[in-house]
Amino acid sequence: MKSHHQSHSSTSSKAHDSASCSQSQGGFSQPQGTPSQLHELSQYQGSSSSSTGTVPSSSQSSHSSSGTLSSLETVSTQELCSIPEDQEPEEPGPAPWARLWALQDGFSNLDCVNDNYWFGRDKSCEYCFDGPLLRRTDKYRTYSKKHFRIFREMGPKNCYIVYIEDHSGNGTFVNTELIGKGKRCPLSNNSEIALSLCRNKVFVFFDLTVDDQSVYPKELRDEYIMSKTLGSGACGEVKMAFERKTCQKVAIKIISKRRFALGSSREADTAPSVETEIEILKKLNHPCIIKIKDVFDAEDYYIVLELMEGGELFDRVVGNKRLKEATCKLYFYQMLVAVQYLHENGIIHRDLKPENVLLSSQEEDCLIKITDFGQSKILGETSLMRTLCGTPTYLAPEVLVSNGTAGYSRAVDCWSLGVILFICLSGYPPFSEHKTQVSLKDQITSGKYNFIPEVWTDVSEEALDLVKKLLVVDPKARLTTEEALNHPWLQDEYMKKKFQDLLVQEKNSVTLPVAPAQTSSQKRPLELEVEGMPSTKRLSVCGAVL
């Protein structure tokens, strides 16, 4: 979106596409509203009375403060001088990421280009309250030298988060709510900013990078401020949001009922199946599994999830080419503990892959959480499932051999875990469609993974042994999660203590599996309590978590 108003302080005869009212450019302008600006401002509801006199009429805006238009009217027609060949054309400035519309006389519009802006009476502020018209108002003395600041920080998925921070004595208000001195809150599109008094509305904030909040259900908007898009999938998208009461960041998955229903032969069955899966997943309680916080059933489904700011394991591996073995061990141990918990509660994930493993922070040592239960199945009485689903590269041989027609069990998740561990340790996949001489299906069903000796020279024999015992074609001979947790590579007390310390930091706790004293075939259940977890109900649904 472009801005067309010009600065009163400008002496140039050139018109500018973007606003020149930024103080970083030296001085502010009173808004010289063009018809497009007036239309843009008219989209904001409820500001017409408070903005009276702020934006001039279209007739007023037809004159330039520098006299450019009147000069052009008197210049005789002549050929324009050509630009010398050695002269570089001027490069356009950076596009604004937000715009503040002034609602009162004495205040000016601001296009935000920089990442940080201070507002106040102090001349060091990027937006200084020093205009003569503003000084004559009765509220001028109620404004602090440094009243508030607006800034943005990089969040997950390289998306910026915009905040407003109160530093005033008399208060800064967003949508009539006091922020509080020294406190911050996220600033969403169309927010009203008032100074000193909640009714003294001075600005409307327009985030030029996000959609309008009004497209979301009112009950959702009452509790959450929607922000940037984090990702998208076949059935919807995931957005970052903020809980209004606490300013806590969350992720909200939006499942399109229409798109979801199109994939079902019986649309009437769609809503009950999604709701059933949501209810089951809400009962899962494990520090290494994404937790559903809330659900809104409106025109679409809105599922509120905890936000993992470290991004996907896939991106972490790609960014580092490969992971250190110690880091792999910490992450993989958590994956095993989480999947073991799922299996003991009668759930098979069926789509485990690095994209579905999320990291709690950008730190190398961090918690992981399993997500995307879109392909998950609740085991029935036979403990076998059918249907072909999941990502081909990570599918177990028994799934591909049967084309989804024969039954298969929780061993499919253990195969996928083996593929993930292989990728983390080596930085490349064991099976790939790029091997043109052998099809992906044949590679997997024969168990012939791509082993590059020079890549594995610095990987321990114990780690490689665990990979080999997970990537076994026969599901009956493949290690279970229990057996994998008892593997010598994972008998690392230092790693386990690090995991426990991370849990303490996150205010979580879990009883770790203990290796049996005699044999590795003994079963020791993970001591986690889940109330009301169904264990015999079948469910087929397209996923509640991206």
From Swiss-Prot:
Quaternary structure and partners: Homodimer. Homodimerization is part of the activation process but the dimer may dissociate following activation. Interacts with PML. Interacts with TP53. Interacts with RB1; phosphorylates RB1. Interacts with BRCA1. Interacts (phosphorylated at Thr-68) with MDC1; requires ATM-mediated phosphorylation of CHEK2. Interacts with TP53BP1; modulates CHEK2 phosphorylation at Thr-68 in response to ionizing radiation. Interacts with CDC25A; phosphorylates CDC25A and mediates its degradation in response to ionizing radiation. Interacts with CUL1; mediates CHEK2 ubiquitination and regulation.
Pfam families linked to this entry: FHA (PF00498), Pkinase (PF00069)
Organism of derivation: Mus musculus
Gene giving rise to this polypeptide: Chek2
Region (T-loop/activation segment): 372-398
Binding site for ATP: 231-238, 253, 306-312, 355-356, 372
Purpose of the protein: Serine/threonine-protein kinase which is required for checkpoint-mediated cell cycle arrest, activation of DNA repair and apoptosis in response to the presence of DNA double-strand breaks. May also negatively regulate cell cycle progression during unperturbed cell cycles. Following activation, phosphorylates numerous effectors preferentially at the consensus sequence [L-X-R-X-X-S/T]. Regulates cell cycle checkpoint arrest through phosphorylation of CDC25A, CDC25B and CDC25C, inhibiting their activity.
Family according to the record: Belongs to the protein kinase superfamily. CAMK Ser/Thr protein kinase family. CHK2 subfamily.
Segments forming domain Protein kinase: 224-490
Null allele phenotype: No overt morphological phenotype but apoptosis and cell cycle arrest induced by ionizing radiation are abolished.
GO molecular function: ATP binding; metal ion binding; protein homodimerization activity; protein kinase activity; protein kinase binding; protein serine kinase activity; protein serine/threonine kinase activity; ubiquitin protein ligase binding
Stretches assigned to coiled coil: none
Protein name (database record): Serine/threonine-protein kinase Chk2
UniProt modification remark: Phosphorylated. Phosphorylated at Ser-82 by PLK3 in response to DNA damage, promoting phosphorylation at Thr-77 by ATM and the G2/M transition checkpoint. Phosphorylation at Thr-77 induces homodimerization. Autophosphorylates at Thr-387 and Thr-391 in the T-loop/activation segment upon dimerization to become fully active. DNA damage-induced autophosphorylation at Ser-383 induces CUL1-mediated ubiquitination and regulates the pro-apoptotic function. Phosphorylation at Ser-460 also regulates ubiquitination. Phosphorylated by PLK4.
PROSITE patterns, sorted: FHA_DOMAIN, PROTEIN_KINASE_DOM, PROTEIN_KINASE_ST
Protein keywords: Apoptosis, ATP-binding, Cell cycle, Cell division, DNA damage, DNA repair, Kinase, Magnesium, Metal-binding, Mitosis, Nucleotide-binding, Nucleus, Phosphoprotein, Serine/threonine-protein kinase, Transcription, Transcription regulation, Transferase, Ubl conjugation
Positions of the catalytic residues: 351 (proton acceptor)
